[in-house]
Each structure stands twice: as C-alpha cells, then as structure tokens.
C-alpha cells in the first residue's frame, strides 16, 4: 500500500488540479494508513489528507484531516455540526444518483449554507457506466446480465447525472439549481434579497432578467445588472401588478444569465432562476349564470349525466367513469380507476417498497353504493367503494349545467398498511388525444421532493413513445404544481383538467406496470392509447442512498389520514 501511495505521489505531485491526497476507499483501518499519511505530510506540506474509512474505525482518527463520510442523512450531519466539531465535514459520496433520484437536496443545501463546518459533498456520480450493445437493428445501453454474465450487479453501474451516451438527465438540472452561487430570498412583495455566494465572481458579469407572466402568458420583461462582490447581499426592488383579479396568477421570474461567452458556456447561458408567485391560483372562478339543466338517464348498466356539451356515464357495476363524450365521441378507451401505484424506481426497490407496499398495487374493488343527488343546475353521483386491503374510496362526481365535471376521490386508507406509493386517478384515453398544453412546472420532469429546477410556466407537448431513458425503466416524466392540463386531438377537441388548486400528472404511451417489469426501454411496446394519471401526490423519489433510505418524512404518504384528490374537467 505504501508503494502505491508513493507511486501516486510521484505521478501527480506537480498537477495543480490535485488539492487533496486520499488514502483509499472503503478499506476500514490499519497501521498502513498511518504510514501513508505520514509519507504525504513529510513530502508535501501544501495539501491536506483525506480518508473516509476512519468513520468506521475511530482509532485511526489521526490519518484524515477531514471528517469524511458517505451517504450521511441531513439530520446526522447537522448533529455533527452542532457538537463542537474538530474537522471540516465533507461527504466523499452523497445523493446517490441511481435512476430517478436526487430528491431531498434542499435539506442538504440549507445545512451546507447554515454551518461553515459542513463543506458539502461529491455526488455519486457523474456518468452512467454502460456498454452500447447491438442486437439486429436494435441498439441499447447494456448492463450487468446483458452479456450472459452471472453473478452480476445488474444496473448498479447506472448512478450518473449523465447517461452513458452523454445525454444530460433531468437530475442534472436539479443539482445545477442547488449548486448555483447566486442566492435569492423573498423579503416582501416587490423586494428580493440577492446574495453573491461566489468566492471570486462579481455578479456584474451576469444579466438578471425580470419577467412577469399572467397565467403563464408573457406580460413584460426588463434586464438589470448589479455590482455585487463575493459574500455581499443586495436588496432588489421589482415592479408588481397592483390590480390582480380573482382567477389571475402573476409570476415574476428572475433569470441570471451569462453576459458574455465563457470557456464553459455561451452568452446567455442560464446560471440560476427564482420565481415569485404574486397570487396563488385557486381557479375558483365565479359561476356563470345558466338556466340549462343537467339531465339524468339511468339504464341497466350506466347512469348518464348530460348537458348540451357533454355526456358523462358511470358504470353501475364498478361505480367508475365509463364514458366522457364530447362532440359525440367518447374520449375514454377504458373505465377510469383509482390508482395507488407507480413504476418502482431504483430507490423504491432499494428500500423494498415494491414488496412492502404491494397491497396498493391494483387492489380488488367492490362497489358498495351509488347515490344520486339532484340539485338546481347540479347533479352529484356519490360512489362508495371498498378495496380488498380494507381501505375505502368515495367518489363524488358533480356535473353542473355549465358542463363542468368536478371529481373528488376520497381515500380512507387502512391504518395498518404500508406507505402509499401514489394517490391518483388513471384514465386510458383514445390514442388521438395526444396534444397537451399545461400550466405548471416543466418542461423537465419534477417531483414532490425534486422540483426547484422546473419553472412554473405554460408548456406544450405531444405524447409520443419517448420517455426519460433511465438505464432500467421506472417512474419518469411527472409534472407537479399543475394549474391546468389540456388534452386535445388534431381537431382541437378534448378536455381541460383544472386543479383545485393544483395537481400532478403523468402522461405517456405506456402503462406503469409494463414499465416496471421491463429491464430495458426497447422491450416496451407503446399502447394504442394515451395513459393519463391525475395525481394528488406520489411519494418523493428520495436519493440519500439507493439501498435503505426512504424519502424524507415530509415526502411520504402515510396511511394514517384521509386524502382527497379534487379536480375539474370541462370539454374543449
């Protein structure tokens, strides 16, 4: 070991990029580490020495000048910071970037900036390791087991912020957001505090664009430059729209961009953004006066509510939405259904959620009762359903004379069950309904605990076979903080789904359970349909590690309370 240490030293001692000598990786302790440490200190007074192994073998505390740890939870590193630490704390590995991961970053970065002794960490890791393999006309990125090798580590080589082919993943942008050294803090409406957290850069090298939007539409924009030295703060005033009527949401977005071309990025490259919502979007618009009636038609198998613009039918066997007819066409290919699952992520598998929570994967349903409540200009269908895991679901479908269908899914879970992966309604739409417009966070995927990199805005997209190509297929592509979602065919016909006040959604050409069982995306067969999930919440993606750590408690759906998903559907 000492010979290797000496060889490394001679090879690298004149490289200015080398700032720390490391004694090894996950090798516990021993006298050889003391000898290596002594060699470096005798031969190089300019660099410090690091070794993570002392975390597990404290009798060799003296061989590292850094408290180096791996995958320590945020509350654990804060405990270290509070207890008179003798060494700076650096995680040589943290936020394990395997598959759809890197949630919870806010918890780490608030601590890094609160305690000087907490010096950050190194993401594991930068790039997936996989090998391009060809089988006939198909090329794909292969991992353990794809070459007939056994035993193997399966896809455990896929821990990167960048895919093996060099494509940047959505995780990369979340890391970028938290790494950026331009910090924003809301002081009050019209005033934001900016801190230059760089060590050397003056913020005058950047343009700061201040953009105002109304319900996602552009209103105005201005550009400012501030002269702010490293470590300093500045309070920046910005204009706000004074008259903001009910149903209007104004957002002010601050975007920090490179003023000039740099060695790493072109002119205009975005460094950081910050958004201020001036009015929360409740979407509780005043009802229009309407004397039209809601018609009720009860048949052997269906209960149908109708107005001049829409027909909504519930199955009398299941109590679920069987038809939603717009312009004479039923947009549904199958009955809607409550859905409490997601395609398991690497982290879900790591803490065995796909085993522990399997009772939430397609529980059998038993219709208990359907009650019709007929009011002036409004009809409610109240549906009670029992699940075979001893939980209950109540639906309240309310169609008013303005053709707005309000849906409430009320889940009363069995308190003895495992954590709930997701709370949602699933719709299998006809394939032609694939053009979407949404007002929410986008356009990259975002989740309950991984969303800061995604701006609230107005986005358009088309549902295709494309997905986020994680090395192993899993939950991907969700959007959060969604105010509304429009889904249309080529003729511009379809539906608008509005949150009360917001919802999450996932839309694709694949069923989550098909995604979950596939070991490579190329094996997935797209459906002749559009698969839509309207989601109350799904648990966070986590990422403190990928083998035991759950998402943080605030991002978990525990079965100890009643959950209500509410949204509204109108025809387009």
What is the predicted function of each stretch?
Residues 1-191, 197-204, 209-218:
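Extended substrate-binding grooves/exosites of carbohydrate-active enzymes
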Residues 125, 212-214, 258, 429, ...:
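Residue-level signal for short segments within beta-strands and strand-turn junctions
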């Amino acid at each position: 070991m000492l010979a290797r240490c000496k060889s490394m030293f001679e090879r690298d001692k004149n490289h200015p990029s080398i700032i720390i000598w490391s004694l090894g990786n996950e090798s516990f302790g021993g006298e050889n580490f003391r000898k290596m440490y002594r060699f470096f200190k005798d031969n190089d007074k300019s660099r410090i020495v690091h070794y993570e192994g002392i975390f597990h073998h404290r009798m060799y505390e003296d061989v590292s000048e850094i408290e180096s740890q791996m995958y320590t939870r945020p509350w654990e590193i804060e405990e270290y910071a509070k207890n008179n630490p003798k060494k700076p704390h650096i995680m040589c590995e943290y936020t394990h970037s395997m598959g759809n991961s890197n949630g919870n970053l806010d918890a780490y970065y608030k601590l890094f900036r609160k305690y000087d002794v907490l010096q950050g960490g190194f993401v594991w890791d930068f790039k997936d390791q996989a090998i391009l393999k060809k089988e006939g006309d198909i090329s794909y990125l292969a991992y353990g087991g794809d070459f007939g090798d056994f035993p193997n580590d399966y896809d455990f080589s896929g821990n990167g912020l960048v895919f093996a082919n060099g494509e940047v993943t959505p995780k990369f942008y979340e890391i970028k957001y938290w790494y950026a050294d331009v910090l924003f803090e809301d002081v009050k409406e019209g005033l934001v505090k900016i801190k230059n957290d760089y060590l050397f850069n003056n913020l005058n090298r950047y343009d700061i664009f201040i953009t105002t939007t109304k319900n996602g539409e552009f209103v105005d924009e201005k550009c400012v430059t501030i002269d702010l030295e490293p470590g300093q703060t500045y309070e920046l005033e910005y204009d706000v729209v004074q008259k903001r009527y009910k149903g209007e949401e104004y957002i002010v977005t601050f975007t920090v961009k490179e003023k000039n071309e740099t060695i790493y990025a072109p002119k205009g490259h975005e460094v950081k953004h910050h958004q201020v919502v001036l009015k929360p979007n409740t979407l509780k618009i005043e009802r229009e006066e309407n004397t039209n009636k809601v018609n009720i038609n009860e048949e052997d198998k269906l209960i149908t509510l109708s107005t001049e613009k829409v027909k909504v039918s519930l199955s009398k066997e299941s109590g679920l939405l069987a038809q939603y007819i717009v312009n004479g066409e039923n947009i549904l290919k199958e009955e809607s259904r409550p859905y409490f699952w997601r395609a398991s992520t690497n982290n879900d598998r790591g803490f065995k959620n796909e085993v522990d929570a399997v009772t939430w994967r397609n529980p059998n349903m038993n219709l208990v009762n359907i009650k019709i409540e007929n009011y002036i200009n409004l009809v409610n269908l109240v549906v009670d359903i029992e699940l075979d895991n001893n939980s209950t679901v109540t639906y309240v479908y309310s169609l008013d004379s303005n053709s707005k269908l309000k849906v409430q899914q009320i889940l009363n879970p069995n308190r003895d069950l495992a954590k709930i992966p997701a709370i949602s309604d699933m719709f299998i739409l006809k394939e032609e309904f694939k053009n979407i417009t949404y007002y929410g966070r986008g356009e990259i995927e975002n989740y309950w605990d991984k969303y800061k990199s995604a701006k609230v805005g107005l986005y358009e997209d088309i549902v295709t076979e494309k997905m986020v190509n994680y090395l192993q297929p899993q939950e991907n592509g969700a959007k959060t903080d969604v105010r509304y979602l429009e889904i249309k065919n080529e003729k511009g016909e379809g539906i608008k789904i509005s949150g009360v006040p917001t919802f999450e959604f996932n839309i694709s050409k694949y069923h989550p359970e098909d995604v979950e069982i596939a070991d490579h995306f190329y094996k997935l067969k797209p459906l002749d349909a559009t698969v839509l999930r309207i989601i109350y919440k799904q648990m966070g993606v986590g990422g403190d590690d990928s083998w035991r750590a759950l998402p943080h408690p605030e991002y978990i759906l525990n079965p100890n309370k009643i959950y209500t998903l509410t949204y509204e559907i109108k025809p387009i």
